[in-house]
């Protein structure tokens, strides 16, 4: 059983999303015996943003790239998509930045959203090829976006749900800490609530993993 753990917050010790992913991963290891984890810190070791030359490597090239740096980028793209496809559980720390996801996380998504690998187009429309995974997103936001006047500005969780759904990942679980910029008391209460929700999320993921094993 393979786990892919990604953090994307530009903060370190004070990062709420990092606190949440750490607890999620710890609880997953406690609940699932044979769990082997791969970790990437997308902020500390950022992935280059997609360029035309990098994206060209998603398809067979007429002739191999000769530039060493570009060859390395093509190899990294393959490594990233292989890690994603091999994973049974994906845990992503995704704070909201300017109503969306960190640019570091977007760079990773742009590498793994590869035609023919994680999705394809058919006569009946697009088809995701990365199904069967359990995705847990540790979401931290400065305000309240699940309801109220700011809900229409949520291009973070909505984007992640749509993008991974397009890739075939339907089991998406959010561990959510809102109101992190609304003062110490609301922030602390929201974090405690998010931490308390992790146990239920881990149980749900465990059931999903067990069901997938039976089907396999």
Swiss-Prot record:
SUPFAM superfamilies: Flavoproteins (SSF52218). InterPro entries: Flavodoxin_fold, Flavoprotein-like_sf, FMN-dep_NADH:Q_OxRdtase_AzoR1, NADH:quinone_OxRdtase_FMN_depd. Binds 1 FMN per subunit. It comes from the Bacteria. Its cofactor is FMN. It is an enzyme of class 1 (oxidoreductase). GO terms for molecular function: electron transfer activity; FMN binding; oxidoreductase activity, acting on NAD(P)H as acceptor; oxidoreductase activity, acting on NAD(P)H, quinone or similar compound as acceptor. FMN binds at residues 9, 15-17, 96-99, 140-143. Keywords: Flavoprotein, FMN, NAD, Oxidoreductase. It catalyses: 2 a quinone + NADH + H(+) = 2 a 1,4-benzosemiquinone + NAD(+); N,N-dimethyl-1,4-phenylenediamine + anthranilate + 2 NAD(+) = 2-(4-dimethylaminophenyl)diazenylbenzoate + 2 NADH + 2 H(+). Its EC number is 1.6.5.-, 1.7.1.17. The keyword Flavoprotein applies. Belongs to the azoreductase type 1 family. Homodimer. Quinone reductase that provides resistance to thiol-specific stress caused by electrophilic quinones. Also exhibits azoreductase activity. Catalyzes the reductive cleavage of the azo bond in aromatic azo compounds to the corresponding amines. This is FMN-dependent NADH:quinone oxidoreductase 2. It comes from Xanthomonas euvesicatoria pv. vesicatoria (strain 85-10).
């Amino acid at each position: 059983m393979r786990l892919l753990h990604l953090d994307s917050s530009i903060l370190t010790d004070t990062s709420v999303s990092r606190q949440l992913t750490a607890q999620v991963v710890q609880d997953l290891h406690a609940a699932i015996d044979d769990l082997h984890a791969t970790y990437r810190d997308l902020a500390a070791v950022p992935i280059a943003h997609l360029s035309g030359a990098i994206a060209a490597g998603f398809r067979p090239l007429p002739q191999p790239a000769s530039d060493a740096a570009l060859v390395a980028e093509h190899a990294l793209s393959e490594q990233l998509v292989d890690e994603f496809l091999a994973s049974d559980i994906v845990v992503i720390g995704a704070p909201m930045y300017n109503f969306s996801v960190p640019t570091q996380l977007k760079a990773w998504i742009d590498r793994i959203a590869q035609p023919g690998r994680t999705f394809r187009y058919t006569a009946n429309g697009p088809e995701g090829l990365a199904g069967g995974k359990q995705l847990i997103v540790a979401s931290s936001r400065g305000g309240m976006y699940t309801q109220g006047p700011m809900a229409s500005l949520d291009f973070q969780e909505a984007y992640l749900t749509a993008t991974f759904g397009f890739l075939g990942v339907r089991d998406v679980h959010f561990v959510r800490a809102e109101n992190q910029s609304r003062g110490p008391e609301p922030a602390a209460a929201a974090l405690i609530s998010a931490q308390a929700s992790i146990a239920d999320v881990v149980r749900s993921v465990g059931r999903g993993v067990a069901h997938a094993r039976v089907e396999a």
